[in-house]
Amino acid sequence: TVNLAPADLPKESGRFDLPIALGILAASGQINPEKLAQYEFAGELALSGLLRPVRGALAMAWQGMQAGRSFVLPQENAEQAAVMRGIAVYGARSLGEVAAHLNGIEPLTQTECKLPQRPSEQSKIPDLADVKGQHTARLALEIAAAGGHSLLMMGPPGTGKSMLSQRLPGILPPLTEDELVEVWALRSLLPNHQQQLDSNRPFRSPHHSASSAAMVGGGSDPRPGEISLAHHGVLFLDELPEFDRKVLEVLREPLENGEIHISRAARQAVYPAKFQLVAAMNPCPCGYLGHPSKPCRCTPESIVRYRSKISGPLLDRIDLTIEVPSLSAAELMQQEAGESSAAVLERVTAARKIQYGRQGKVNAELSVSELDGKARIQKEAQEALGTMLEKLSLSARSFHRIMRVARTLA
């Protein structure tokens, strides 16, 4: 009899094949049962006895490390699981190799993984030098990168909003070791779990037709969605008002707390979702409101309806909102390249180093109490800010957003 306890916890995937087979071998006296207590096992078995890769290897390695056990799993998963420090990882090709290891006949070799020291294929990330003009938008992008701030760009079609957003990863520092482990633990839960390790920050750009489940994750067996896959990276939402309003509203919790709670009938899951939101939109349905040469064809009612798709509470959580105007013919024809991503990255890295030295986090993550303690402002600035808050009827959250951005600028 094979018993998978606890019975009330739903089981899925073939990762239990190897533990079940080893239990049978131990019960029949073919391996030493006492050896099993030292290890965690996971792997799908083929009819030939070969081990097939499973998803969730890095997440399982984290649990094994917490339990103080070594981890035996398919060879294809071993390098990924070995990213977790503090646990011995052994990769095996077959059930026979695992049995020989446990019996001391032919020990498995411990897998060591060298963490990537620099982003792989950095040259494939588009360079900011390709962007012509748009000096204000480039500055806003640099400020957002330096402080981890969310950013909304509004402007007519073809002004470079998407182009700028796609270049944000190129001016963000590479993942730290702890961040890399978190990012890859989430990726290991997906079916395409055999991707090559790299330290590039995630960049997710879901289509505006994406459902709530695709955005936050879910299903009968909860899996991370787009916002969790953008953890420690960038979530880019192009054509923001075209997203379903319910989809946009689910962003409010992770933008505030950095995690998402998923509840299903069978189980509940909590996934990290500390991402940097970058969004782009047109000023109106036709896209040409305020364009210097193309007239807008929209009625005032349609413009109001279009913009009302984005709720006030969501807009209140976006730190920076800028207009990206259309370029003149002279700006489009200029031959001189703009400042490169590498040059901007140096300034962003220096700014982040100061922030981590002061407070251990970027300014966008400062709590209200931390702002009150660390971001004191002069009396004259306090009076000017108070006047602006009253004149524009800004909320308390808006006040704190202004303080965070001001601290980054300083």
Describe the role of every protein-language-model region.
Residues 1-152, 156-159, 263:
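Peripheral, non-AAA+ core regions of ATP-driven protein-machinery
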Residues 47, 235-236, 242-243, 329:
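Residues immediately C-terminal
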Residues 3-12, 222, 245-410:
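Basic, amphipathic alpha-helical bundle interface domains used for macromolecular binding and assembly
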Residues 152-195, 257:
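Walker A/P-loop
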Residues 44, 153, 168, 237, ...:
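Hydrophobic anchor at the beta1->P-loop junction of P-loop NTPases
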Residues 106-143, 147, 175-227:
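P-loop NTPase nucleotide-binding/switch module
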Residues 232, 238-240, 250:
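Walker B catalytic acidic pair
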